[in-house]
């Protein structure tokens, strides 16, 4: 009996509308909000991001990413027996975006559900899928991270609205007799709910509280670098590997400073870090699978290499997955 899981296909999707920093600066100026390309690049490393149109939902972006991943794995939607979608921007309050995506794919009948851990969501979802495959509850899972985060942005707050973008990434995770997912490590600390949140909710058809993103950037940075280092070392420990055994670090693409800080703590040079934040911005739960698909399709990440995926997000949540491609 297979006791392991392995990624057999990856995919990604970005909305056609691409905004460079210059584009966004011009739009914000119309609102009386001042910023500049230099200010954004120096603080975040971001040069462009993609925004979805009003009629495009997370399931739409996830569908394209899923189809690419299925094609890369050489499997049909009917072959999938588990669908997990990581998102903080679901199509509806309910049902889950996973169920909506399942219907669009034509993969009806298998378990389908969402995971909500914000920017750590894909790490959580991949870990859950791996656990279900190891237990025998599934053999071939579709794991998707998809976001239309632009819907949550306060475009009067230059410190946050320049950071985020929309997109989706997906993987097919299959049962295997040889290890693919080597180790995972998940954590959360609800004491830090307020440093990164969208505090609004719906009651009686009305929005209560603030429906837009709020973030204490300094607090997030201080927490993120420390916890990501611990999670990375935890999965290396569990797998019996060292930092030097990591071929590629694929971190959540939050901003270049957090990524540089994490790599430095692990003793990894930036030329072994997959970086897409410059072109995609922070796409929350989509950022890691987007970066993974980019690394695979560009030839950076190759079969047999060890990849360290790690993410941190609102909640406060964080985690890491170590895998052999």
UniProtKB/Swiss-Prot annotation:
Residues 253-257 are annotated as: ACP-binding. GO terms for molecular function: 3-oxoacyl-[acyl-carrier-protein] synthase activity; beta-ketoacyl-acyl-carrier-protein synthase III activity. It comes from the Bacteria. GO terms for cellular component: cytoplasm. It catalyses: malonyl-[ACP] + acetyl-CoA + H(+) = 3-oxobutanoyl-[ACP] + CO2 + CoA. SUPFAM superfamilies: Thiolase-like (SSF53901). InterPro entries: ACP_syn_III_C (IPR013747), ACP_syn_III_N (IPR013751), FabH (IPR004655), Thiolase-like (IPR016039). Disulfide bonds: none annotated. GO terms for biological process: fatty acid biosynthetic process; secondary metabolite biosynthetic process. CDD domains: KAS_III. Gene3D superfamilies: 3.40.47.10. Its main location: cytoplasm. The active site is at 119, 252, 282. Its EC number is 2.3.1.180. It is an enzyme of class 2 (transferase). Pathway: Lipid metabolism; fatty acid biosynthesis. Keywords: Acyltransferase, Cytoplasm, Fatty acid biosynthesis, Fatty acid metabolism, Lipid biosynthesis, Lipid metabolism, Multifunctional enzyme, Transferase. Pfam families: ACP_syn_III, ACP_syn_III_C. Coiled coil: none annotated. It is found in: Cytoplasm. Catalyzes the condensation reaction of fatty acid synthesis by the addition to an acyl acceptor of two carbons from malonyl-ACP. Catalyzes the first condensation reaction which initiates fatty acid synthesis and may therefore play a role in governing the total rate of fatty acid production. Possesses both acetoacetyl-ACP synthase and acetyl transacylase activities. Its substrate specificity determines the biosynthesis of branched-chain and/or straight-chain of fatty acids. The last Arg residue of the ACP-binding site is essential for the weak association between ACP/AcpP and FabH. Homodimer. This is Beta-ketoacyl-[acyl-carrier-protein] synthase III.
């Amino acid at each position: 009996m297979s006791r392991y899981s392995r990624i057999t296909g990856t995919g990604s999707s970005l909305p056609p509308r691409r905004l460079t920093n210059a584009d966004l600066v011009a739009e914000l100026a119309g609102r009386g909000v001042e910023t500049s390309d230099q200010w954004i690049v120096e603080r975040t490393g971001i040069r462009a991001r993609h925004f979805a149109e009003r009629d495009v939902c997370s399931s739409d972006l996830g569908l394209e990413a899923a189809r690419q991943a299925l094609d890369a794995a050489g499997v049909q939607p009917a072959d999938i027996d588990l669908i997990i979608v990581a998102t903080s921007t679901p199509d509806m309050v309910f049902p889950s975006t996973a169920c909506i995506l399942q219907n669009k794919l034509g993969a009806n009948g298998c378990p389908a559900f969402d995971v909500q851990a914000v920017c750590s969501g894909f790490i959580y979802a991949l870990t859950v899928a791996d656990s279900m495959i190891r237990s025998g509850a599934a053999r071939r899972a579709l794991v998707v991270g998809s976001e239309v985060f632009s819907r949550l942005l306060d475009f009067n707050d230059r410190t946050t609205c320049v950071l985020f973008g929309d997109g989706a990434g997906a993987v097919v995770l299959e049962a295997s007799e040889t290890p693919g997912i080597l180790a995972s490590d998940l954590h959360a600390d609800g004491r830090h709910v307020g440093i990164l949140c969208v505090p609004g909710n719906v009651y009686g058809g009305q929005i209560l509280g603030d429906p837009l993103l709020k973030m204490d950037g300094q607090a997030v940075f201080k927490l993120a670098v420390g916890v990501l280092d611990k999670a990375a070392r935890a999965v290396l420990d569990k797998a019996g590997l060292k930092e030097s055994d990591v071929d590629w670090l694929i971190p959540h693409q939050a901003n270049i400073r957090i990524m540089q800080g994490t790599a430095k703590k692990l003793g990894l040079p930036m030329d072994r870090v997959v970086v897409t934040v410059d072109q995609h911005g922070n796409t929350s739960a989509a950022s890691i699978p987007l970066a993974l698909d980019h690394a695979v399709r560009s030839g950076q990440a190759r079969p047999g290499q060890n990849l360290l995926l790690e993410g941190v997000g609102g909640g406060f949540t964080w985690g890491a997955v170590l895998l052999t491609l």
